[in-house]
Amino acid sequence: MNKSFTKKITKKNIFYIILICFILSVIPLYVIGMYAHPSVDDYYYGTETVQVWNETHSFASVVKCSFDEMINTYNIWQGNFSAIFLMRLQPGIFGEQYYFIAPLILLSAYIGFSIFFFYTALKKIFKADSYLAATVGICLTFVSMQLCTTPSDSFYWYNGAIYYTFFYSLMLFLFALLIRMRTAKAAGTIILTAISSVSAFLIGGSNYAAALFMCIILALSAGSAVYFVILRKNKVIRPYHMAAYIIVAAAAMAGLFISMAAPGNALRQQSVGGSTGIVKTFVYTFAFGGYSIAKVLNAPCLIFFICMIPVFYRIARRSGFTYRYPLLIAVFTFGLYCSMGTPVFYAQGLRMPYRMMNIIFFAAYVLITFNLIYFLGWIGNKFESKTYKQLIGGSTASYACGMQGYKFESKTFKQLIGGNTASNACSMQGYKYKKYSNEGDSHDENFYDKNFCDRDFRNKNAQKITADGITACEEPSMIKTDRACIILEKVIDCFFEKIKASRKNALLALAISLCAFIIACIGCIEVGETEYKSGDAGFGKLPLSAAATLSLINGDAKTYDCELTARDEYLRSTSDDEQFVTVPALSKRPAPIYHSDITDDPGDWHNAHVAMYYRKECIWTE
């Protein structure tokens, strides 16, 4: 490869290239969000607040109405207080033209908090450098968004997405703050505790998937902090850190307890039937956990993670962890991951909404990433150590060279196995050893003695090389033979150094991963008859950005926006005497912003929600 070109391939340049590509990929997602409109429960939960706004045009009155309705819902239907409060503030109540604020908030929250979480975790826990951590965070966020199963539920339908995607994103933000809190100073810990406690309390009052998962993580974090501070006397985690983790965990559990204690929960449970039972819930939980991971690991995603192995290996080796229990960690984290589905399986059986599936799929990327890093770290530790022992016939670097009275300095040994300098091992030019005397004193000695370059001198006291490894020299002053040097140079250099990809190669692997992912996505695209265009062909299984771009280019998004805007203006213009109204059906249903619409059946529950919103008896399509 051209050297001038190679010099330009730096971690900084690759980071900015991937960042620019990511920004370009999300531009269509924001643009098509300008054409989004309310759907289904947006109308139901906005019925009271839109009426208050139309009568008063007071934002404070709308907020008060939302709070009052939250209390009412808490008593008669469900206890997710923080989510219910936000649901009634959907932007469309202030005017249909303001609904674009919903996807703007939802997309920005997921993108920002997801990247921030991955960046913080990789940098603070695994000691990855800033550019690499940020680049990996961008790539993982990009892939999770492009392969989203039902993007309308996650980013463009306010009611469903604020309930699940937004609070899942807030949970990622909370976890990032908790990671940073571990090494924060006292003043910083106070600020982080305040922000984290409020976030944890609000998440506790949101959907039960995120609330339960968060409480388990926070309880484990608080317990770990107590263990390290009180029992281990850890100097990094201070007593004020321990207190902070306990406070945040208490806030989270308080929010969840208030939500679970709502009288409305029992009434709602009666409407859907009895609970599933513990045994069935347990089976459903783990069965769906396995299914969801298999669902996420489709061809594009699988290719992406395979191509990311060099990157994850570099991150794993940089951290310095021992990675001793890969199987235990995999089972434990899988159990945590599966807990997200437990509440809905217990309450409703297998009836899980797509918007909830989406956040479980998002969480799968976190699970796969950190387990893959841990497993690669275990592979590196296990097989590097084993190969060293086979090469040197012992367990220490000093025994490797047969220098029973000498010991390599760590830096020098790194140079010895690092590549080009290994070829100089025979002559020992510039290598230092630390010589230990009987009295325990030590001093550095440079070996430039001509005897070390003398082949006869070396061969005279050469050590034996067998298929199982290198035996120790009979005399402590003996140096390695030419053949031993070749083994060190060829095996260690070619094997380990190829696995231990340089920072440049790791970042190149990121770019290759994205290219392979895009190619795999293209291969998964289907062409067939659409659901709403009789006899007309369309594309299916498009990545999110491609689907949004196609809807913008072919005009479907614009047509959809015009038709729903005209419908809204017509319904607002009708008099109170007109209680039975028909409207034209939609001609376009553009992905990814279309969620659902009213039907030609006057008794359809979709129609009932829209009728309540516009204060009509019944609305249906022609």
Regions found by a protein language model. Give the residues of each.
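Membrane-interface junctions at the ends of membrane-embedded or membrane-associated helices
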Residues: 1-8, 124-125, 179-194, 223-239, ...
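Transmembrane alpha-helical segments
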Residues: 110-122, 170-182, 215-223, 305-309, ...
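Aromatic-anchored segments of alpha-helical transmembrane domains
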Residues: 141-147, 200-205, 251-260, 333-344, ...
